């Protein structure tokens, strides 16, 4: 049975709601800057990251249903998990209109999610490293593209983060501060 988890709620828990079709598993389009130089074969391609893209589901209604509950469910921004990728989630927003009149009348409609380009492991817990006992710790990216981790440092003194034996980040905790968050996806 097809289902999604949206706003931390399983679609199968909404009376009368059916997820009749899930989106295909796709890779987002790469943003590129292409430069053509006269007299040079080909072009220079600069990769600029990935585009946000649409994932569309088809929904239906059956039996007893509350259209207002369905309308409320399919709104806003949240993490979404599709049952054909039930070990991953996407950060998504519903931005397009949904024809709920068609849904109520013909009991079918489409819902389009604007998803950010990366999907994340659903059950990946936080890693905790005690630097009093471990002076170094290796963390591997389990994905197939570059990783943009969120790192929370707790402690005092000087902390240095290396990537492939190259110092990437050094942080000195100011007096009285014991925690800092490095969100590499937001470059914050």
Locations of regions flagged by a protein language model:
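Solvent-exposed edge beta-strands and adjacent loop segments
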Residues: 1-54, 86-102
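Mixed-charge, glycine-accented linear interaction segment located at domain edges/termini
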Residues: 2-6, 114-116, 188
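Short, acidic/charged, Gly/Pro-enriched secondary-structure junctions
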Residues: 3-5, 58-98
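Short beta-strand and beta-hairpin "edge-sheet" elements
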Residues: 23-25, 79-124
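Solvent-exposed loop and beta-edge segments used for protein-protein assembly and interaction
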Residues: 49-51, 74, 103-107, 141-145
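Beta-strand secondary-structure signal
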Residues: 54-58, 110-112, 150
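Solvent-exposed residues in well-ordered beta-strands and their adjoining turns
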Residues: 60-62, 114-116, 154
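Intrinsically disordered, low-complexity segments enriched in serine, threonine, and glycine
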Residues: 123-188
């Amino acid at each position: 049975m097809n289902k999604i988890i949206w706003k931390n709620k399983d679609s199968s828990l909404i009376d009368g709601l059916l997820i009749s079709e899930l989106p295909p598993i796709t890779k987002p389009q790469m943003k590129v800057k292409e430069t053509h130089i006269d007299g040079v074969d080909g072009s220079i391609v600069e990769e600029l990251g990935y585009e946000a893209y649409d994932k569309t589901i088809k929904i239906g209604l059956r039996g007893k249903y509350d259209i207002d509950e369905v309308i409320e469910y399919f709104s806003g921004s949240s993490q979404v998990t599709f049952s054909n990728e039930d070990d991953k989630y996407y950060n998504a927003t519903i931005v397009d209109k949904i024809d709920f009149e068609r849904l109520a009348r013909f009991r079918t409609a489409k819902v389009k999610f604007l998803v950010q380009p990366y999907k994340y492991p659903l059950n990946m817990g936080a890693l905790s490293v005690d630097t009093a006992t471990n002076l170094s710790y290796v963390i591997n990216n389990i994905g197939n593209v570059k990783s943009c981790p969120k790192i929370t440092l707790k402690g005092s003194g000087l902390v240095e983060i290396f990537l492939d034996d190259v110092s990437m980040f050094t942080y000195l905790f100011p007096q009285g501060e014991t925690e800092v968050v490095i969100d590499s996806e937001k470059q914050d």
